[in-house]
């Protein structure tokens, strides 16, 4: 069973610039994975429409982060997996996630061949790790966008498989493009 990803935190404002709550985020996903009280997906694949999980049109990360919505209450913010529209095994898709800083014009656009993105707004980060200037990161000062298979896939038969047969090669693709607009 293999489900590798990258857990980099992004803050397009730059180092020592505070929270990412005003960063507009857009995700090409009309579905997401509800979680239980231990942050594990329940197996349900739910619609984003009409919920704080709807990022099909760009909106500030902080707009709905404190909404009275059980999945956000469990983790004190975002920490869920979004299911990409039109995913097919082995098919690379461009422009799946876009993160912006409108003040600087910096834009991060991500593509992948993975079926989803786990998006975590550093809700429980409290003083570690240290940033590039040696200052501890604080809560919601970065957002991790992890292109990956769905968490707990081996235990959810309706999720895409993460099984890798012995002797087979594992490969996935994630592309980060940076622009200034």
What are the roles of these predicted feature ranges?
Residues 1-181:
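An exposed, glycine/acidic-rich loop-and-rim segment of catalytic or binding clefts
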């Amino acid at each position: 069973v293999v489900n590798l990803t990258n857990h980099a935190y992004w803050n397009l404002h730059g180092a020592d610039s505070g929270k990412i709550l005003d960063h507009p985020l857009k995700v090409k996903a009309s579905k997401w994975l509800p979680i239980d009280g231990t942050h594990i997906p329940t197996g349900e694949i739910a619609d984003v429409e009409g919920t704080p999980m709807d990022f099909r049109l760009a909106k500030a990360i902080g707009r709905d982060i404190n909404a009275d919505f059980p999945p956000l209450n469990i983790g004190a913010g975002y920490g869920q997996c979004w299911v990409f529209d039109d995913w097919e095994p082995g098919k690379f898709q461009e422009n799946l996630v876009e993160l912006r800083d409108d003040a600087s014009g910096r834009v991060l656009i991500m593509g992948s061949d993975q079926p989803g993105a786990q998006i975590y707004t550093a809700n429980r980060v409290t003083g570690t790790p240290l940033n590039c200037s040696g200052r501890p990161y604080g809560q919601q000062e970065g957002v991790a966008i992890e292109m990956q298979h769905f968490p707990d896939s081996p235990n959810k038969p309706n999720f895409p498989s993460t099984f890798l047969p012995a002797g087979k090669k594992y490969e996935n693709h994630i592309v980060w493009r940076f622009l200034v607009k």
